[in-house]
């Protein structure tokens, strides 16, 4: 459990939708994606809102209420190390995408995001971080368009 009082508040992104992800096993599969993305509050002000695109999965950035901080941390634990933390002033971004296939519904495949685009209106231009997905990581780039 993440009972650590030193945890920073997070901005949380949630989306649940059907999509297709290209996996590290080099095949396409229909994916029931339930992604939880967390961005350090030092990187993104609580007031911001906007889209984040991870491959074919899109979500909206929303500020997490203090009461949801524990639930967010629990999701990070449930990701079984699939969340990748990056230290430094840039904060961190992590994604856990359980997909359908192989081990059954919700089985966590090591999916690779083909592209990550964050609107520059959502993130300060100085933001530099990584998206961790399974055992792969991709840079988070800033763009004015998805």
Swiss-Prot record:
Membrane spanning stretches: 1-21, 35-55, 87-107, 111-131
Topology versus the membrane: Multi-pass membrane protein
Localization: Cell membrane
Keyword annotations of the record: Cell membrane, Membrane, Transmembrane, Transmembrane helix
Entry superkingdom: Bacteria
Gene Ontology terms: cellular component: plasma membrane
Protein name per its UniProtKB record: Uncharacterized protein MT2143
């Amino acid at each position: 459990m993440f009972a650590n009082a030193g945890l920073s508040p997070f901005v949380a992104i949630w989306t649940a939708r059907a999509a297709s992800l290209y996996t590290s096993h080099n095949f396409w599969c229909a994916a029931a994606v339930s992604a939880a993305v967390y961005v350090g509050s030092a990187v993104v002000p609580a007031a911001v809102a906007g889209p984040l695109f991870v491959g074919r999965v899109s979500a909206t950035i929303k500020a997490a209420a203090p009461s949801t901080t524990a639930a967010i941390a629990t999701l990070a634990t449930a990701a079984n190390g699939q969340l990748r933390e990056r230290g430094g002033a840039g904060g961190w971004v992590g994604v856990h995408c359980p997909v359908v296939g192989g081990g059954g519904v919700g089985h966590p495949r090591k999916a690779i995001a083909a592209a990550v685009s964050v609107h520059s209106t959502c993130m300060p231009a100085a933001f530099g971080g990584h998206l961790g997905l399974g055992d792969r990581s991709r840079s988070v780039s800033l763009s004015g368009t998805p």
